[in-house]
């Protein structure tokens, strides 16, 4: 099969002949079951992971019966699978992410309303790297408030209880400090009365 050329657009919008199928013998042997258009597509773009119709390919071209071509199957390498992405991270990671989000929202509210009594200046916006103590963490400026202010911040009860449930701490009876402010008689309304 002779080398085919077709007009192609160059960068300036003009046309120039482009040579395709530089090795027609190899293309016709390795992809003997493909039509001329398919050979061009394989010669131009060869992605072993996904076939042209969106289905997963095995890395070796398949014949019409679905079996790999004998010529190219010995030279094809199987595609490597990327490590699976964990959609369900560990509970402690979810809890720390939730606390970080709340912390940044709380600092954002404090910065938006600096005129409140007891707040001399807006709190610094600490990034995730600073909380993790990474090497590239930024230290607060000399005039910034001390990090001890976080200890006096009120915690939203809904958020705290959602974290308790998420971590499974609601099933632990030996943590009475989590139930501060709740009376033991509050729980009697939850139980059905004997009738």
From Swiss-Prot:
Q: Where is this motif: Nuclear export signal?
A: 160-169
Annotated region (Disordered), positions in chain: 1-24, 51-149
Query: Mind telling me which GO cellular component terms the entry cites?
Result: cytoplasm; nucleus
Q: How is it modified after translation?
A: Phosphorylated. Phosphorylation changes in a cell cycle-dependent manner and reduces its transcriptional cofactor activity.
Q: Does the keyword Protease apply?
A: no
Q: Where is the composition biased (Polar residues)?
A: 97-106
Main location as per UniProt: nucleus
Q: Output the Gene Ontology terms for molecular function.
A: chromatin binding; protein homodimerization activity; transcription coactivator activity
Localization of this protein = Nucleus; Cytoplasm
Please name the GO terms of the biological process aspect recorded for this protein, alphabetically. Answer: apoptotic process; branching involved in ureteric bud morphogenesis; melanocyte differentiation; negative regulation of DNA-templated transcription; negative regulation of neuron apoptotic process; nucleocytoplasmic transport; positive regulation of DNA-templated transcription; response to transforming growth factor beta
Composition skew (Low complexity), residue ranges? 54-78, 137-148
| Keywords annotated in UniProt | Activator, Apoptosis, Cytoplasm, Developmental protein, Differentiation, Nucleus, Phosphoprotein, Transcription, Transcription regulation
Domain of life (superkingdom) = Eukaryota
Under Pfam families, the record lists:
CITED
- Quaternary structure annotation from Swiss-Prot or TrEMBL: Interacts (via C-terminus) with CREBBP. Interacts with EGR2. Homodimer. Binds to RBM14. Interacts (via N-terminus) with HSPA8; the interaction suppresses the association of CITED1 with p300/CBP and SMAD-mediated transcription transactivation. Interacts (via C-terminus) with TOX3 (via HGM box); the interaction increases estrogen-response element (ERE)-dependent transcription and protection against cell death. Interacts with ESR1; the interaction occurs in a estrogen-dependent manner. Interacts (unphosphorylated form preferentially and via C-terminus) with EP300.
State the family it belongs to: Belongs to the CITED family.
Task of the protein: Transcriptional coactivator of the p300/CBP-mediated transcription complex. Enhances SMAD-mediated transcription by strengthening the functional link between the DNA-binding SMAD transcription factors and the p300/CBP transcription coactivator complex. Stimulates estrogen-dependent transactivation activity mediated by estrogen receptors signaling; stabilizes the interaction of estrogen receptor ESR1 and histone acetyltransferase EP300. Positively regulates TGF-beta signaling through its association with the SMAD/p300/CBP-mediated transcriptional coactivator complex.
Q: What is this protein called?
A: Cbp/p300-interacting transactivator 1
Question: From what organism does this protein derive?
Answer: Bos taurus (Bovine)
Q: What is the lineage of its organism?
A: Eukaryota, Metazoa, Chordata, Craniata, Vertebrata
| Annotated gene | CITED1
């Amino acid at each position: 099969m002779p080398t085919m050329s077709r007009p192609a657009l160059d960068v300036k919008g003009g046309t120039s002949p482009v040579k395709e199928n530089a090795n027609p013998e190899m293309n016709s042997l390795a992809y003997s079951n493909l039509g001329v258009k398919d050979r061009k597509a394989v010669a131009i773009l060869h992605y072993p992971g996904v076939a042209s119709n969106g289905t997963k390919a095995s890395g070796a071209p398949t014949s019409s019966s679905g079996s790999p071509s004998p010529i190219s199957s010995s030279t094809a390498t199987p595609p490597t699978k990327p490590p699976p992405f964990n959609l369900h991270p560990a509970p402690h990671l979810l809890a720390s992410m939730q606390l970080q989000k709340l912390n940044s929202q709380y600092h954002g509210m404090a910065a938006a309303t600096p005129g409140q009594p007891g707040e001399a200046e807006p709190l610094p916006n600490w990034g995730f790297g600073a909380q993790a103590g990474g090497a590239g963490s930024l230290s607060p400026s000399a005039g910034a408030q001390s990090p001890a202010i976080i200890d006096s911040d009120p915690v939203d009860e809904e958020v705290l209880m959602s974290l308790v449930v998420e971590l499974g701490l609601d099933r632990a009876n030996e943590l009475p400090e989590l139930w501060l402010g709740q009376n033991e008689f509050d729980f009697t309304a939850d139980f059905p009365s004997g009738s």
